[in-house]
Amino acid sequence: LQDAEDSSRFDADDTLAGEARELSTPKXHSEGTFSNDYSKYLETRRAQDFVQWLKNSXXXXXXXXHADGTFTSDVSSYLNDQAIKDFVAKLKSGKV
């Protein structure tokens, strides 16, 4: 009789644990979906703000030259970083 009571108590505990997992799964999914949607919204908003900033600053010709120089500098930095990564990868592989 004692074993039957223990068994039914364990079954009830398993059922409660299963229900808790089922309840937390949709919550985690909905939180993840919200975070993903909100991140996409923020990314779109930043892009819109950037385009608006470009439109507003395009009126000044001096700003266009600065933007070109900034772009060139950013590309140069990226290419330099990429060359360093490639060199380190070759060092690791023993090809140098």
Swiss-Prot record:
It comes from the Eukaryota. Residues 1-35 are annotated as: Disordered. InterPro entries: Glucagon, Glucagon_GIP_secretin_VIP. One of its GO terms (cellular component) is extracellular region. Keywords: Cleavage on pair of basic residues, Hormone, Secreted. Induction: Produced in the A cells of the islets of Langerhans in response to a drop in blood sugar concentration. Belongs to the glucagon family. PANTHER family: GLUCAGON, PRO-GLUCAGON. This is Pro-glucagon. The gene is gcg.
